Design a protein with these regions (language model features):
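N-terminal anchoring/stem segment of glycosyltransferases
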Residues: 1-94, 101-105, 227-231, 274-281
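Catalytic core and acceptor-binding pocket of nucleotide-sugar-dependent glycosyltransferases
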Residues: 169-283
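GT-A fold catalytic core of metal-dependent nucleotide-sugar glycosyltransferases
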Residues: 87-157, 189
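Charged, glycine/proline-rich intrinsically disordered loops and linkers
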Residues: 16-39, 74-86, 144-173, 210-222
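Short, solvent-exposed loop/turn segments at secondary-structure junctions
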Residues: 10-13, 68-72, 116-118, 141-142, ...
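Short His-Asn-centered micro-motif
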Residues: 6-8, 65-66, 112-114, 120-121, ...
Length: 287
């Protein structure tokens, strides 16, 4: 059984950052993308060392991908055919492209977003039998009801936006709109289920559908459609449903969604630092 753990980091140029939270920012508040860019730079070596430490502790090789020729080629290709897709979304499609590239060599793969901090030496692969399905986190609990949505309650990256965007795509495919909001910050998968997912098999048509839906008000009101976009997690949810792919939901121990809580529970194994408060993560790590 060949296994691999990998992560990925691109320092997106400031002039290519999309200020997606403009409408929810308070006066003098720094946009989330700027905070992310700065915190990744400041914590780069610690974040990299942490993932290497975890991989070594469970005896699995680790690979780090960054701004190399392979990424540049992918970005150039995507922006050539889909110039309306932001660099942020290109980056997130690429991390899934890497999943497929690695599946050509490895049987089981664990992907960790660069803002994930490992707090355990417990072996992910021994705790999650990937023959049972792709292991991801269910973010549906963060979805707002349609009547409560305003420009101030969400952004284009909010779970709410992804939920209704996936509904719209599924309906376009004449499928049930029932879906889960997937978070792709941590993914455990094997070759068999990735092949069944067929994430990139119909990519051109999927992106065209997503583009058409950004201006289609036939089913959803404008206040919903205005938040539709080209998110990798939206498409991931659609593909899980479209191809009936087995899935198992990571619990809070293995994917702790660290956002506004201000603390990390003792039993946590992987912290996904959405808020980029790495100082809290390091205090927990070194405790």
């Amino acid at each position: 059984m060949k296994r691999i753990i990998y992560s990925f980091y691109i320092d997106i140029p400031e002039d290519e950052l999309d200020i997606f939270d403009r409408d929810v920012l308070k006066k003098d508040e720094v946009p989330r993308n700027i905070i992310t860019k700065n915190e990744f730079k400041y914590n780069y070596f610690k974040l990299l060392a942490n993932k290497k430490w975890y991989a070594e502790s469970i005896g699995v090789p680790f690979m780090m991908f960054e701004y190399d020729l392979r990424y540049q080629k992918f970005e150039k290709e995507v922006k050539k055919y889909y110039p309306f897709i932001t660099t942020y979304n290109v980056v997130n499609f690429y991390k899934l492209n890497l999943l497929y590239e690695l599946s050509k060599t490895y049987d089981e793969i664990l992907y960790l977003d660069f803002d994930v901090v490992c707090l355990t030496k417990d072996n992910f692969f021994n705790n999650w039998n990937l023959d049972k399905g792709i292991a991801v986190f269910d973010n549906t609990f963060k979805v707002n009801t349609m009547e409560t949505i305003t420009k101030q309650t969400q952004t284009i990256r909010s779970p709410t936006a992804k939920y209704y965007n996936a509904q719209a795509m599924l309906m376009e495919k004449n499928l049930s709109p029932i879906n889960k909001v997937i978070n792709t910050g941590i993914i455990g998968a094997n070759k068999e289920h990735l092949n069944k997912l067929k994430y990139f098999d119909d990519f051109d048509n999927d992106i065209k559908t997503m583009k058409n839906l950004t201006t289609n008000y036939d089913v959803f009101p404008k206040k919903i459609v205005d938040f539709f976009g080209y998110d990798n997690e939206t498409l991931f949810s659609v593909k899980l449903n479209e191809h009936n792919v087995p899935v198992q939901w990571l619990d809070n121990k293995w994917h702790y969604f660290f956002d506004r809580q201000g603390f990390i529970p003792k039993e946590t194994k992987f912290v996904h630092a959405i808020n980029k408060k790495f100082d809290v993560c390091w205090r927990r790590y070194y405790a």
